[in-house]
């Protein structure tokens, strides 16, 4: 699902094209329902790249390397649970997405601060497990969990809008 940050489509562009007031942005974002957001695993903002970045030739990981990491991660998931992380039920998520003490506290604080549902919490855990798999890690590390929490960007935007 794609969503523009607000009505004119220039969210976060930095070009000065956006003329929306903060109230109109807040109203626009509040139209997205919480139950719908709960069902989206990754909320990612993809900014427009300047032409210089496109010409530099340094665009990150190449497709072949990325594909190899994805294939290896999927094999780990199938070997561990017999299914991809996205298809784990609650009991499987609890079993295969365990966190250490400090990370459990971090997740609980994020859930409270962002006012997330149990469904969102389980999605965060499955995404963190997937990030760990892509990293070749047997356990979910703090960096995997914080990255997964970071992908709840729309929850933060809506939470901020409803708090104002």
How should each PLM-predicted stretch be described?
Residues 1-164:
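Basic, amphipathic alpha-helical bundle interface domains used for macromolecular binding and assembly
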